[in-house]
């Protein structure tokens, strides 16, 4: 089956999002499936990046069908609604004439190899071929048709709204897929086969034996389950897995994405997954289940409204679990956020607030810009609908197509004249929420923001970035004070790039970003892209990635300090972390020390009297330390007071314990329940209160007599 080409930088495919965190009562029987065939109007990105060894996967294929999502705890079901207009797929207005057939025979078929394309040389410039230039005017209308819509969403670059394959241009990658779908497949509903076929058309990894096997297991587990919208629950599982595939996840992670809700929402348990698919998949699914449980507790207790506890929570989520489980949880939430319209307004806002306070920081710390932008824009829409609508309208009116196209042409000529060969030159735009946030923080109008639209230039080598910067400043006058060198001074999450603002011929400022391929992968896909890119240079990259991950978790304190620092003190970028991921500062004391053991503060979830809190303890703290703190902080006159630790029956991660010297670990859930039966508590508490009152009165009387 031959499919249309996709643009290299297209952002993750749009799709309905479903969350298991929603209303359990909306579970129902699934009607006859009405899954639509895969759409060709949006294209997923070429999957680039991924955890080394763990995150290597085939390249992305063609376009995705729209589907629903699932987010948190398994028993929750949510409607799928029409996808928000701003959440559409984006892509790159690319001048890079790469062909899939050139990459297909490359030795390494990882997402990164797709991104790299054929090797470049000065003699073979990446400039647009003559045929592309000749047809540019013809394609310009479709090329920019979806720009403003994409700008309102989470896309990173401009993407042509591709129609049938006859319109494939020279700057795109043509993908040829086999027509073979899953071979021997168990009995399942017709709609499930349609979902599998759609996933296989969107990404090759869904042809792999393990992924096909887990797909049918997920279908069996969720058979008959529907979301409030009436869509099959399985559709959310598929969309979550597709999101993971598009950032370079391997078959183990994609399989866990398909099964991520089975422990919570079906008859399947850890042992079943372990025996069917091995420890790798089972451990990830169990990890996601625990993360979902913590997220549900946080939502029920409105943890997002308490800044300190919210910061502790997303730090804990990063540190406690396999990073891949956190990625699956994030993909789950991205998909769920796209279908909030089906929920009551109050639930929409509560869910969006939790996403903004907990999951956006998670995506930011992982460095996955495309997911972070999607989540921010969706939260902005639900939390500030009027501001969102107004800013969307202004952005539509301010879009200047002529400025972008003329700037691309001018820079392309200048780079060729300077003998510089680039990997990709594309238009880019700032996300809607980023514009809104910048206007608030710096008290600016939309006209005063200079980086709403701009260009992005990607090179093979770092030195070419600085040479290209000189070319840019020769072509356009530089706006004073607007140059930032994030290559020599990376951001907290490892972001590296050169940013400069220049003035166009019509005296309109625009931004130019210059980076290498490695920097681009890091910016778009975070830590996974970095390790995947480096995999070929180190035989022990799995060990290195774990060390780098442990080091990076240490920077949470710097991020918290940035958050609390008054805006009046200046740019928050002035505060630098000791270890900007994934490198170390030269003077960092941890550069050559072992980082695998966690010796910093630990965060645990405390459940007491049906209330949840996120508590911070020193390393090596025990359950006894926690109970001492609870006893100290509980007022004696509280009707819920249980005065002696011996009267409490602690549970850690739902298991009763007898050894109070057990050490606490990051992410433990500690429940303190009374040892007495629940029905005896009122009388017990009243008697203890009377005893205390009588004893306290007698003590005060004796003390007063002795003083006289």
Curated annotation (Swiss-Prot):
CDD domains found in the cross-reference section: HDc, NT_Rel-Spo_like
Sequence ranges of Low complexity compositional bias: 29-41, 118-131
Reactions accelerated catalytically: GTP + ATP = guanosine 3'-diphosphate 5'-triphosphate + AMP
Keywords in alphabetical order: ATP-binding, Chloroplast, GTP-binding, Kinase, Nucleotide-binding, Plastid, Stress response, Transferase, Transit peptide
Residues in HD domain copies: 233-337
Gene3D superfamilies noted in UniProt: Beta Polymerase, domain 2, Hypothetical protein af1432
Transit peptide feature range: 1-58
Recorded GO CC terms: chloroplast
SMART domains for this protein: HDc, RelA_SpoT
Entry keyword annotation includes ATP-binding: yes
One example GO MF annotation: GTP diphosphokinase activity
Induction: By jasmonic acid (JA) and infection with the fungal pathogen Magnaporthe grisea.
First-level EC class: transferase
UniProt keyword annotation of Disulfide bond present: no
Alphabetical GO biological process terms: guanosine tetraphosphate metabolic process
Places the protein is found: Plastid, Chloroplast
Region feature Disordered, mapped onto this chain: 1-50, 109-134
EC number: 2.7.6.5
InterPro entries: HD/PDEase_dom, HD_domain, NT_sf, RelA_SpoT
Similarity annotation: Belongs to the RelA/SpoT family.
The protein's role, per its UniProt record: Probable ppGpp (guanosine 3'-diphosphate 5'-diphosphate) synthetase that may be involved in a rapid plant ppGpp-mediated response to pathogens and other stresses.
Name assigned to this protein: Probable GTP diphosphokinase RSH3, chloroplastic
């Amino acid at each position: 089956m031959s499919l249309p080409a996709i643009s290299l930088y297209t952002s993750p495919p749009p799709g309905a999002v479903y969350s298991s965190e929603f209303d359990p009562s909306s579970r129902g029987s699934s009607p006859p499936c009405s899954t639509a065939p895969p759409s060709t109007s949006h294209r997923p990105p070429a999957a680039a990046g991924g955890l080394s060894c763990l995150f290597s996967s085939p390249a992305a294929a063609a376009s995705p069908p729209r589907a629903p999502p699932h987010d948190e705890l398994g028993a929750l079901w949510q409607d799928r609604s029409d996808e928000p207009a701003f959440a559409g797929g984006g892509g790159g207005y690319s001048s890079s004439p790469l062909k899939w057939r050139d990459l297909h025979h490359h030795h390494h078929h990882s997402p990164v190899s797709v991104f790299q394309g054929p090797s470049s040389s000065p003699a073979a410039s990446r400039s647009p071929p003559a045929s592309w230039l000749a047809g540019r005017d013809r394609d310009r209308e479709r090329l920019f048709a979806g720009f403003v819509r994409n700008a309102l969403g989470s896309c990173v670059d401009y993407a042509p709204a591709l129609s049938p394959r006859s319109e494939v241009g020279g700057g795109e990658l043509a993908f040829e897929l086999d027509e073979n779908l899953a071979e021997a497949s168990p009995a399942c509903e017709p709609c499930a086969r349609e979902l599998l076929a759609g996933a296989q058309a969107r990404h090759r990894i869904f042809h792999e034996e393990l992924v096909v096997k887990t797909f049918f297991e997920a279908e069996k587990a969720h058979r008959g389950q529907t979301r409030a919208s009436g869509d099959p629950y399985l559709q959310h599982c598929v969309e979550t897995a597709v999101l993971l595939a598009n950032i370079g996840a391997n078959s183990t992670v994609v399989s866990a994405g398909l099964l991520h809700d089975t422990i919570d929402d079906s008859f399947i348990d850890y042992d079943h997954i372990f025996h069917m698919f091995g420890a790798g998949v089972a451990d990830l699914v169990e990890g996601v289940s625990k993360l979902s449980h913590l997220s549900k507790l946080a939502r029920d207790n409105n943890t997002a409204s308490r800044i300190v506890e919210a910061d502790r929570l997303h730090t804990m989520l990063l540190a406690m679990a396999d990073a891949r489980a956190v990625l699956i949880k994030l993909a789950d939430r991205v998909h769920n956020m796209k279908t909030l319209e089906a929920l009551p307004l109050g639930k929409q806002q509560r869910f969006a607030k939790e996403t903004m306070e907990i999951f956006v920081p998670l995506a930011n710390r992982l460095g996955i810009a495309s997911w972070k932008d999607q989540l921010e824009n969706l939260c902005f829409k639900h939390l500030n609908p009027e501001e969102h609508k107004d800013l969307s309208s202004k952005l539509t009116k301010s879009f200047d197509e002529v400025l972008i196209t003329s700037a691309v042409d001018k820079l392309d000529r200048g780079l060729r004249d300077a003998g510089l060969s680039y990997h990709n030159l594309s238009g880019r735009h700032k996300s809607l929420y980023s514009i809104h946030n910048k206007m608030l923080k710096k008290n600016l109008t939309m006209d005063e923001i200079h980086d709403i639209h701009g260009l992005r230039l990607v090179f093979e080598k770092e030195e070419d970035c600085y040479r290209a910067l000189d070319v840019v400043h020769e072509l356009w006058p530089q706006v004073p004070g607007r140059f930032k060198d994030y290559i020599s001074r990376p951001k907290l999450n490892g972001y590296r790039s050169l940013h400069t603002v220049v003035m166009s011929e019509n005296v309109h400022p625009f931004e130019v970003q210059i980076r290498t391929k490695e920097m681009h992968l890091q910016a778009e896909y975070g830590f996974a892209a970095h390790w995947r890119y480096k995999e070929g240079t180190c035989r022990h990259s799995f060990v290195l990635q774990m060390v780098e991950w442990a080091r990076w978790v240490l920077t949470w304190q710097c991020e918290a300090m940035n958050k609390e620092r008054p805006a009046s003190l200046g740019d928050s970028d002035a505060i630098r972390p000791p270890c900007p991921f994934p490198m170390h500062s030269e003077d960092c004391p941890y550069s050559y020390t072992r980082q695998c053991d966690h010796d910093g503060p630990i965060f645990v979830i405390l459940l007491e009297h049906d209330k949840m809190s996120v508590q911070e303890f020193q390393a090596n703290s025990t359950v006894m330390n926690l109970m001492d703190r609870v006893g100290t902080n509980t007022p004696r006159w509280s009707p819920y007071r249980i005065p002696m630790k011996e009267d409490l029956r602690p549970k850690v991660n739902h298991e009763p314990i007898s050894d109070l010297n057990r050490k606490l670990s990051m992410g433990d859930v500690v429940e303190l329940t009374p040892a007495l039966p629940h029905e005896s508590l009122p009388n017990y508490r009243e008697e203890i209160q009377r005893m205390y009152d009588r004893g306290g009165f007698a003590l005060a009387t004796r003390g007063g007599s002795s003083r006289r």
